[in-house]
A protein has these predicted regions:
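Short acidic, Pro/Gly- and aromatic-enriched capping/linker segments at domain boundaries
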Residues: 13-33
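Extracytoplasmic
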Residues: 6, 12-19, 45-307
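Well-ordered beta-strand scaffold positions
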Residues: 21-24, 38, 178
Length: 307
């Protein structure tokens, strides 16, 4: 990754550290810049040994929803501004995209064009989402999206980040190893995205409380997990009217724990089906997906970080 557009894509002095695995550093002083990219030599031989699945890959994995769909990135939609979108579609005033039913390779719909997918660019409304943009769908939706494979067989949690709004809907989530919905199993009870926690606290449904209270939120973090929820990640600031607020402190930014159990390497599909098909204008919103090994959320000595 790079912090400067047009740079070498390697920031000097930044190196990820994993306990028990030192890694192989990049020799940034010897990087070469041919016509079509960059070449970064390594200072040692990089091998895929037992440390990779047992140490390096036993971390929380977070995927922005649009990164799960190749076409969003290869066609320049992900992260686009309103001005860039106008250039793409060659039509002034456009700040959102509506996609054809079979546009995405890793997304399957089960009711044809009744499920409407939309992408709202990051500077259109300043949404309180990760990176400010919003991928959502409307109508009596019923679709499945392919998730990344886990790096190693084991016990994991799957969570979804979303922004609660009264305009949202209510849905049932299913999980399976293929897009064949007859083989999928329901995950927990339906999720009601319409429920917005009160800024003063929401003990009954989500367990959310202002993050500065009760030991800086540590006590209510556990209360939320008992309800099947988590706060938004401390990793990013929200946009829009609440700009400047950390997601963790924003009452609408939530994570729902969808599944906890054994997962094997291989294909993984998640289905989202409305339980309110008559509410055709209600929205489904997916901000990001987290796949988390049990060594992170159930470590015998350490609590999972709030980022």
């Amino acid at each position: 990754l790079t912090s400067t557009a047009g740079s070498t894509s390697v920031d000097d002095g930044i190196q990820a550290e994993v306990e028990g695995a030192t890694g192989v550093p990049v020799d940034t002083k010897k990087s070469a810049n041919p016509l079509n990219g960059w070449i970064h030599p390594l200072k040692d031989i990089l091998t895929y040994n037992s440390l990779v699945p047992n140490k390096v890959l036993k971390e929380r994995m977070r995927f922005d929803d649009t990164s799960l769909l190749d076409e969003m990135m290869t066609n320049g939609f992900r992260g686009a501004t309103k001005a860039e979108l106008v250039t793409l579609v060659k039509k002034s005033g456009k700040s959102r995209v509506i996609f054809p039913t079979k546009y995405f390779r890793n997304l399957v719909t089960y009711n044809d064009n009744q499920t409407v997918f939309k992408y709202l660019v990051k500077d259109e409304g300043g949404y309180a989402n990760y990176q400010g943009d919003e991928f959502l769908c409307e109508g009596p939706y019923d679709f499945a999206i392919k998730l990344p494979s886990v790096p190693k067989d084991g016990t994991y949690e799957i969570r979804m980040g979303y922004t609660a709004e009264t305009a949202r809907g209510m849905l049932q989530v299913y999980l399976g190893t293929s897009s064949d919905r007859s083989t999928m199993q329901a995950c927990d009870i339906p999720l009601d995205m319409r429920h917005v926690p009160s800024k003063s606290g929401d003990a009954a449904v989500t367990g959310w409380q202002p993050s500065g209270e009760l030991d800086n939120g540590v006590a209510t973090d556990q209360a939320m997990r008992n309800h099947g929820y988590m706060r938004g990640a401390y990793y990013y600031y929200v946009e829009g009217p609440n700009k400047g607020n950390i997601s963790r402190a924003h009452h609408k930014n939530l994570r729902r724990i969808l599944y906890r159990g054994h997962l094997n390497q291989g294909d993984l599909w998640m289905r989202f089906k409305t339980v309110l098909p008559e509410a055709t204008s209600s929205q489904f919103h997916l901000d990001y997906i987290e796949i988390v090994p049990s060594e992170v959320y159930n470590h015998p000595e350490y609590s999972e970080d709030i980022f």
